[in-house]
């Protein structure tokens, strides 16, 4: 079983990976946009991680408002990367993503919305299909004035729904470079201001559980979730 705390970010360079380790992370999910996916780029990042005993896993974020394009991209990248995210915001995309157990994380469901992007029905779907909801701390930091308060309200609302319906939640730094990297304690401290400490601990550990689940499904003896070949 995979243990530790893992960040979700867009950091691929050697200095950034060393900074993540120095800040106290056990590993990270390095995420590329699906339109810019490069196997060489992620392999290089994984190698940087191995050189400093830091675990780097591959991720792709699918960003499109077209549902058919999104579903095609999910099929294309599901077996190429460890973690699959889909950018939310559009209510139809939010719902469809939470119906798909091939997707790991619904990223920023509140993006460009006046509401939080989720309701009790969608939260239940996420719980049923093991699709996590992302709190992107980087987006919160980069926003200003009313936009920041709106995102913070969306976080609080989505946390309330997710806790009630046992929907997985992850928090990410969303860092693009060393200047956006945050220590685990910083993210945990923020979570403690919007949720109780036990729930905050659960959230900070969820990313590693998602990675562990996907690694389990890649085992050759696993035919599908809950069904595997047992050798006598």
UniProtKB/Swiss-Prot annotation:
Xref: NCBIfam families: RNaseP3Mthcoc
GO cellular component, one term: cytoplasm
Originating species: Methanococcus maripaludis (strain DSM 14266 / JCM 13030 / NBRC 101832 / S2 / LL)
Record GO terms (molecular function): ribonuclease P activity
Name of the molecule in the record: Ribonuclease P protein component 3
Oligomeric form and interacting partners: Consists of a catalytic RNA component and at least 5 protein subunits.
GO annotation, biological process: tRNA 5'-leader removal
Coiled-coil segments: none
Enzyme class: hydrolase
Nuclease listed as a keyword: yes
Protein's cellular compartments: Cytoplasm
Keywords: Cytoplasm, Endonuclease, Hydrolase, Nuclease, tRNA processing
Catalytic reaction equation(s): Endonucleolytic cleavage of RNA, removing 5'-extranucleotides from tRNA precursor
InterPro entries, A to Z: Pol/histidinol_Pase-like, RNase_P_comp-3_arc, RNase_P_p30
Function per UniProt: Part of ribonuclease P, a protein complex that generates mature tRNA molecules by cleaving their 5'-ends.
Entry's family note: Belongs to the eukaryotic/archaeal RNase P protein component 3 family.
Temperature dependence: Optimum temperature is 36-38 degrees Celsius in the absence of L7Ae, 48-50 degrees Celsius in presence of L7Ae.
């Amino acid at each position: 079983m995979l243990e530790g705390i893992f960040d979700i970010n867009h950091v691929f360079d050697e200095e950034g990976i060393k900074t993540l380790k120095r800040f106290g992370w056990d590993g990270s999910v390095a995420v590329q946009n699906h339109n810019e996916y490069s196997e060489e780029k992620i392999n290089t990042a994984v190698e940087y991680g191995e050189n400093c005993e830091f675990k780097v896993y591959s991720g792709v974020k699918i960003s499109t408002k077209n549902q058919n394009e999104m579903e095609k991209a999910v099929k294309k990248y599901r077996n190429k990367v460890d973690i699959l995210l889909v950018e939310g915001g559009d209510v139809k995309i939010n719902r469809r993503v939470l119906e798909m157990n091939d997707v790991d994380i619904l990223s920023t469901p509140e993006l460009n919305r006046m509401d939080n992007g989720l309701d009790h029905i969608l939260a239940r779907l996420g719980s049923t299909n093991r699709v996590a909801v992302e709190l992107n701390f980087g987006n919160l930091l980069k926003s200003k004035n009313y936009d920041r308060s709106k995102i913070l309200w969306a976080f609080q609302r989505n946390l309330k729904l997710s806790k009630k319906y046992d929907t997985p939640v992850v928090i990410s730094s969303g860092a693009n470079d060393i200047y956006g990297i945050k220590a685990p304690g910083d993210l945990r401290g923020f979570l403690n201001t919007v949720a109780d400490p036990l729930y905050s601990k659960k959230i900070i550990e969820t990313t590693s559980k998602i990675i562990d689940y996907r690694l389990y499904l890649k085992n050759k003896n696993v035919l599908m979730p809950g069904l595997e070949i047992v050798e006598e």
